Amino acid sequence: MVTPNELVCTAAKHGTTTFIVDPHEAANVSGAAGIDYILNQTEKSPANVYVMMPSCVPSTSVDDNGCVFSANDMYPYVRNQRVLGLGEVMDDPAVIHAEESMFVKMNLFENRTIDGHAPYLPNKELSAYKMAGVDTDHEATTFEYALEEVRRGLHVHIREGSAAHI
């Protein structure tokens, strides 16, 4: 394991110019301190480092991870130029059922990108997810599901990683 700055410096030597990170695991462990650590560590890095504000800390209401990161905790970051929007909204039931706490977070980033995380929602739920304000998704692993997401107006991120070809 390396520090965020070490990772960015090494990757920059090989041509990576920009990172967009969702530090939800750092927030799960240490809340705002985890986000501040990443922002501070990468402030003077040789590549651009941007953050998507973690939307689901904990991931769902039944998780017990030690930290809660609410809309009130996010508010100080809203005007930070390196915070681009709201990170992957994993709690799709909170979006679909219009839970107030989720919509307060989404409203903080209303005119910015709101990243999704919607693995195989049925059509009606997928439509509600998009209509609520989610802009993107990276969970489509089949052409058919990606097409359904595009038809509903979501921008599909092509997923390339160790689990992308399972």
State where each predicted segment sits:
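Acidic-and-aromatic substrate-binding clefts and catalytic sites of carbohydrate-active enzymes
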Residues: 2, 27-29, 163-164
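Di-metal (Zn2+ and/or Mg2+/Mn2+) metal-binding site signature of metallo-dependent hydrolases
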Residues: 1-8
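Divalent-metal coordination cores built from histidine and acidic residues
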Residues: 8-113, 154
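Active-site core of metal-dependent hydrolases
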Residues: 88-166
